[in-house]
């Protein structure tokens, strides 16, 4: 990897004097180590500044621990006193940290594809052909459309598709990262080699994890101790409903688009309660700029519990209701 950003006295920053090639090399480095989600364009703007800030934060604070296990290395080990604050600008002290990270095989870099367009087309075809056994494929495809636009690789830069969450308000920290077509999420960074092999190198395994996650949410987060409050309010606490059709009906788990059409629709507006009687209301968030959703299929009229499971796939709270609305729209409208 070319590292033209390593130059005595050079500082790469917004409005700085770095050349487009120097900025591109820095962006490519940040992309490969999981701090930039895309945009290798030679322009040092807000996205690049946020990526630099996130790396600076980790050099100061990331000891490799995570609630889902430990990273193979502590990012702090590369600092060696060179980075003392989060500035959003890459000086030569930070550049030297990046060089050491890139040269250390223990810091796992993100995989890339020699043919991202072809590989994305291939995995889309495989997903579309999946049988609706453990989960309805129409719902799964609708989730993957929302998560990654049905892409495992970012076609603009060839690296595996990555989503960066920043949920530690007031800091530059990237709190979790979603990878690939299903945006399988981990909370430690960098990832371990086994994780790269499991759900980054192999798109099919990534999709399988999404299938398993959706089925787990259906089985354990709709009815019972960790129930879906919208389902309880609208349907009650009765048994889970896999499909409104019997298992021997040819429409079983496959006629979801027609069910979405038959369910009718409603407009969802900002300040609407999540459901009748709910204290929470639809509001814009850092992930969803608008809380206006016209013509969304009525979740309670599907005759199954997958509309509630897809919300729990995203967790709980206001973001999960945004997510649910978008997935239900996909179920009905995707070609």
Describe the residue ranges of each PLM region.
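Cell-envelope/ECM-targeting effectors and their regulatory/trafficking segments
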Residues: 1-125, 309
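Catalytic glycan-binding domains that act on GlcNAc-containing polysaccharides
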Residues: 86-89, 105-335
């Amino acid at each position: 990897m070319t590292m033209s950003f390593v130059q005595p006295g050079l500082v790469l920053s917004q409005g700085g004097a770095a050349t487009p090639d120097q900025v591109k090399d820095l962006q490519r480095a940040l992309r490969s180590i999981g701090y930039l989600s895309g945009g290798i364009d030679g322009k040092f703007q807000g996205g690049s500044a946020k990526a630099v800030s996130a790396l600076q934060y980790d050099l100061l604070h990331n000891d490799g621990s995570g609630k889902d296990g430990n990273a193979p290395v502590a990012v702090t080990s590369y600092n060696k006193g060179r980075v003392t604050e989060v500035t959003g600008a890459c000086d030569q002290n930070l550049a030297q940290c990046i060089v050491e990270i890139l040269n250390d095989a223990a810091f796992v870099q993100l995989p890339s594809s020699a043919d991202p367009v072809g590989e994305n087309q291939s995995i889309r075809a495989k997903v579309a052909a999946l049988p609706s056994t453990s989960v309805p494929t129409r719902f799964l495809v609708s989730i993957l459309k929302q998560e990654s636009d049905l892409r495992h690789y970012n076609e603009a830069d060839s690296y595996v598709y990555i989503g960066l969450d920043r949920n530690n308000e007031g800091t530059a920290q990237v709190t979790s990262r979603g990878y690939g077509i299903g945006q399988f999420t981990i909370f430690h960074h960098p990832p371990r080699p086994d994780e790269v092999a499991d759900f980054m190198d192999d798109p099919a395994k990534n999709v399988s994890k999404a299938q398993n996650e959706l089925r787990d949410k259906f089985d354990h987060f709709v009815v019972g101790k960790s129930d879906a409050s919208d389902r309880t309010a609208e349907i009650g606490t009765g048994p889970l409903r896999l499909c409104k059709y019997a298992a021997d009906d040819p429409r079983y788990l496959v006629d979801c688009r027609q069910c979405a059409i038959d369910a009718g629709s409603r407009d969802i507006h900002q300040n609407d309660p999540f459901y009748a009687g709910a204290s929470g209301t639809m509001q814009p968030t850092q992930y969803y700029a608008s809380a206006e959703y016209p013509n969304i299929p009525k979740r309670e009229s599907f005759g199954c519990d997958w509309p509630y499971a897809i919300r729990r796939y995203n967790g709980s709270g206001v973001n999960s209701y945004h997510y649910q609305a978008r997935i239900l729209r996909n179920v009905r409208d995707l070609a």
